[in-house]
């Protein structure tokens, strides 16, 4: 039944879906909840204190959810609405023939991003199974696409990633997901410590491929999406930690291009039970890494700043 409804939604105009999604997103935000508190807290930590900004962010989250069925089952129609003036960044990286690691944060429409990138050649992406079993048929049916190969987020998937990169192909992943047990370190993200995955940094250092951050900005009135690309400067830092910091900094730069479309309600700063110890509460919080996509570790903020983390 859920699959039928989702397929039915795919036939509605994109502008209708996004408008309905924005209304639902605003309604969900107005209800006092953990989500509302988290959304306000995360936007404030990043320097966005304006209540109107938070409401726009909540609305864009709803639009992101509502447009997914159309992207999954009316893919070609949606791809025709993708525009970009930054395609030479991708073309230059692919021309080097050493593979490309695409990093797509929870920004804009990350569902359209992967599908657009298949226009350049085979793309292997990593996924996590849906937590709700009822959603699994929807997720599985959405992965059937030419040039798009999905692998699970486990050791098998990592091996598939390495093989694809060594063939000179492209792989893609979400770099701002909270990592699993033993796969993350605490690093600055918008001036606060966040448990940061090391997989992207390890892959980049192991394979020496081009690293490009990418996101699809949602355009108004259902006009489609604008693709953004940001290539990580080379040579990369020599250590996994420094490279992961550089990735976080580049993500901040990309997010600040259209910050209201970042998924601020995602529990990015949580501390899983199996996570390494959070930095001492007495230590100063890391400074906001700002817009620079550099590879050097960020210096700490002045003493007295507060450090935050969530469960």
Question: Each predicted region: which residue ranges?
Answer:
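Membrane-anchoring hydrophobic helices of lipid-metabolizing enzymes
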Residues: 1-104, 138-140, 145-147, 298, ...
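Short hydrophobic/aromatic-rich motifs at helix boundaries and adjacent loops
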Residues: 10-15, 61-63, 84-86, 109-113, ...
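Non-catalytic C-terminal accessory region of glycerolipid acyltransferases
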Residues: 22-24, 28-31, 46-58, 94-95, ...
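Active-site metal-coordination segments of metallo-dependent hydrolases
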Residues: 36-38, 129-133, 193-197
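Short, flexible loop segments at the rims of nucleotide/cofactor-binding pockets, characterized by
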Residues: 76-82, 128, 147-153, 189-191, ...
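Short amphipathic alpha-helical segments and helix-helix/interface helices
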Residues: 87-91, 114-115, 136-140, 161-162, ...
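Catalytic core of membrane glycerolipid acyltransferases/transacylases, capturing the structured
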Residues: 96-155, 181-185, 218, 222
């Amino acid at each position: 039944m859920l699959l039928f409804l989702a397929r039915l939604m795919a036939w509605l105009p994109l502008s209708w879906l996004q408008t309905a999604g924005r209304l639902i997103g605003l309604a969900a935000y107005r209800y006092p909840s953990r989500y509302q508190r988290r959304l306000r807290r995360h936007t404030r930590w990043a320097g966005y204190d304006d209540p109107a900004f938070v409401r726009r962010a909540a609305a864009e989250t709803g639009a992101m959810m509502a447009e997914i069925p159309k992207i999954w089952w009316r893919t070609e129609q949606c791809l025709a609405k993708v525009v970009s003036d930054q395609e030479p960044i991708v073309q230059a990286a692919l021309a080097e023939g050493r593979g490309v690691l695409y990093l797509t944060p929870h920004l804009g429409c990350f569902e359209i991003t992967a599908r657009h990138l298949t226009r350049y050649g085979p793309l292997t992406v990593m996924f996590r199974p849906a937590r709700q079993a009822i959603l699994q048929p929807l997720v599985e049916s959405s992965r059937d696409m030419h040039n798009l190969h999905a692998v699970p987020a486990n050791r098998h998937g990592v091996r598939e990633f390495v093989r694809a990169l060594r063939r000179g192909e492209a792989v893609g992943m979400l770099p701002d997901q909270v990592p699993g047990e033993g796969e993350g370190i605490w690093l600055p993200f918008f001036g606060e410590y966040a448990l940061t995955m090391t997989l992207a940094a390890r892959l980049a250092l192991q394979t020496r491929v081009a690293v490009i951050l990418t996101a699809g900005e949602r355009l108004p009135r259902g006009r489609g999406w604008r693709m953004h690309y940001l290539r990580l400067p080379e040579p990369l830092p020599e250590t996994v930690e420094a490279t992961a910091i550089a990735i976080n900094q580049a993500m901040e730069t990309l997010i600040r291009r259209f910050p209201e479309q970042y998924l601020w309600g995602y529990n990015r700063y949580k501390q899983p039970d199996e996570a390494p110890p959070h930095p001492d509460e007495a230590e100063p919080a890391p400074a906001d890494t700002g817009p620079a996509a550099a590879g050097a570790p960020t210096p700490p903020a002045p003493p007295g700043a507060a450090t935050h983390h969530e469960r």
